Amino acid sequence: MELAIIVAAAENHVIGRDNGLIWHLSADLKRFKALTTGHAILMGRKTFESMGRALPNRRNVVISGNPGFVAPGAEVVPDIPKALELLKGEERVFVLGGGSIYREFWDKASQLYLTEVHTSPEGDTFIPAIDPDKWELIGREDHYADEKNEFDYSFLDYRYPKIFFRIAFDRSFR
């Protein structure tokens, strides 16, 4: 199974405020859909609740410590090891967040699809900094704000070198 993180974050690493996104970027939503459709997606309860529903044409898996939590259209598991066990037959799994889920998988994913939003808003949810000694930038597209995208933004694709990925993944979740 290949783990890939997909996230939109501001230059100051903010990804959200009050359990929601701070910006609207139509191009980012289109990229998200193109990359994740047909694959499994893994997220925490708050992320699922902020989306309001399971996403179509994807296997939705939600991690929640609340045994009574129900997510229509999604499979709910109590923790990360159970999620990985459930998803072990999947070729690729996209990690959607939120903040604590990103932190758990940050050094365990082999790819990172980052939409860097060129602003620095206040927020209450963050991603970790990208360590250039571990993450290799393999693709970049810069875009300007327009009528459908309120801020300048960049699509940044990173690869986590395999030696680090294998060691980190093998030692994780034990």
Residue ranges and their predicted role:
Residues 1-174:
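Enzymes that bind and transform nitrogen-containing heteroaromatic metabolites
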